[in-house]
């Protein structure tokens, strides 16, 4: 194993030992502008759990008044002097849903609504981390490629912190998400091509002009931001973990981060059980799940799903994602676009949670897994909704339908509702 420029005396990260390549094991000092290993592998942040256990307890956390992702600073790779980012990211609600649990034959079911974050998606957790690390690196410009949510989250978090942004999106990105970028003042490049072509263009620009890289599979710190969703779930459940945790999967960064957070908590003794992960992908694009189901290395796939945020045919964080699913003895579940839209409507009508298609893919997978007997009766499950439904209104209308459109006539209203099997009494 090669060790590159490791000097714990000089690093400002007292809780971090190093960054280690998940492919070859090479280690690097955890400097702010880390990217991939020289072998092309993805880096993983390695923590000093003895140091963390000496400085971080459940009692410390219980007494901490900070309802954001930064309440877990001891488990995050940021310098002590780095300020919390301006937007209030994290500490999203975890709703218990007994009605839906009964419908699915589950013992208990919780829905984590990360669509309430500042730019309406879980990606705010990664972007807040990117802003913090860009601050440490002394950067002025942050850039990324994205199918939508990472872009809007970077644009918003960077705007609040005073950074300039360049954001590359495939031209199929929903207009609602692109509108967010423009409102936040991002310099937006709509690329005539798929996500892979968009990613390559962003990588070339970042290398050419030296911008801070917010691309999740290149920057190892971003999954550390995303892992805070699992830290919150554990704390909100009073450290009693469910049997399963379901989440939608695109490039693999989120599910990898979720698993990293759970392992961190297990390593410091905050939890004594690790849930099995449910990796949810669309049948229109499921390269990570296919690798699990066929027990072979992942291969690129075409991108053909309404769940745009997880429509990633070449997942850049596949190595970490596959490790997470396999280590957790997880389940890979593919769902159709029709099942995704049905889950969107089901969540809205039973739980009052409005998620975008990619955001509810985890719930669609839970439903399908229950129906197929992959999840046992009476099991406990957390399903994470990763993005708000207002980001993609066109598909929400496909799911829920149009309102009745009539003249101002109550009798006509009753008549039209009757055609839909709805009464006014």
Predicted regions: what they are:
Residues 6-425:
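PLP-dependent amino-acid enzyme catalytic core
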């Amino acid at each position: 194993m090669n060790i590159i420029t490791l000097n714990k005396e000089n690093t400002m990260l007292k809780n971090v030992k190093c960054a280690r390549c998940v492919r070859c094991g090479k280690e690097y000092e955890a400097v702010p502008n880390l990217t991939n290993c020289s072998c092309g592998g993805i880096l993983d942040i390695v923590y000093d759990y003895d140091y963390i256990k000496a400085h971080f307890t459940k009692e410390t956390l219980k007494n901490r008044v900070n309802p954001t992702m930064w309440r877990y600073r001891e488990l995050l790779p940021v310098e002590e002097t780095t300020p919390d980012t301006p937007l209030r990211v994290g500490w999203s609600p975890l709703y218990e849903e007994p009605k839906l649990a009964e419908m699915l034959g589950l013992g208990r079911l919780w829905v984590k609504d990360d669509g309430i974050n500042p730019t309406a998606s879980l990606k705010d957790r990664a972007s807040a981390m990117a802003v913090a690390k860009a601050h440490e690196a002394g950067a002025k410009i942050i850039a990324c490629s994205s199918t939508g949510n990472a872009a809007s989250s970077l644009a918003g978090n960077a705007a609040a912190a005073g950074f300039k942004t360049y954001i590359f999106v495939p031209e199929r990105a929903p207009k609602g998400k692109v509108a967010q970028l423009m409102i936040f003042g991002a310099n937006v490049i709509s690329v005539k091509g798929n996500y892979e072509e968009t990613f390559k263009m962003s990588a070339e620009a970042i290398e050419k002009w030296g911008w801070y890289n917010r691309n999740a599979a290149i920057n190892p710190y971003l999954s550390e931001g995303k892992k805070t969703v699992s830290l919150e779930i554990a704390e909100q459940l009073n450290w009693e973990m469910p049997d399963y945790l379901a989440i939608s999967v695109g490039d693999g960064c989120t599910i990898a981060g979720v698993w990293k957070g759970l392992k961190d908590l297990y390593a410091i003794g905050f939890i004594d059980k690790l849930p099995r992960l449910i990796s949810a992908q669309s049948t229109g694009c499921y390269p990570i799940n296919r690798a699990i189901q066929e027990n072979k290395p992942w291969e690129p796939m075409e991108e053909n799903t309404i769940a745009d945020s997880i429509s990633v045919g070449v997942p850049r964080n596949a190595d970490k994602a596959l490790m997470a699913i396999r280590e957790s003895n997880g389940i890979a579940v593919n769902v159709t676009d029709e099942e995704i839209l049905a889950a969107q409507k089901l969540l809205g009508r039973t739980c009052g949670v409005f998620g975008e298609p990619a955001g509810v893919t985890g719930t669609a997978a839970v439903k399908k897994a229950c129906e197929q007997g992959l999840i046992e009766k009476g099991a406990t499950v957390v399903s994470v909704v990763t993005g708000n439904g207002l980001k993609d209104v066109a598909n929400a209308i496909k799911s829920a339908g149009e309102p009745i459109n009539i003249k101002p006539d109550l009798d006509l209203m009753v008549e039209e509702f009757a055609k839909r099997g709805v009464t006014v009494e």
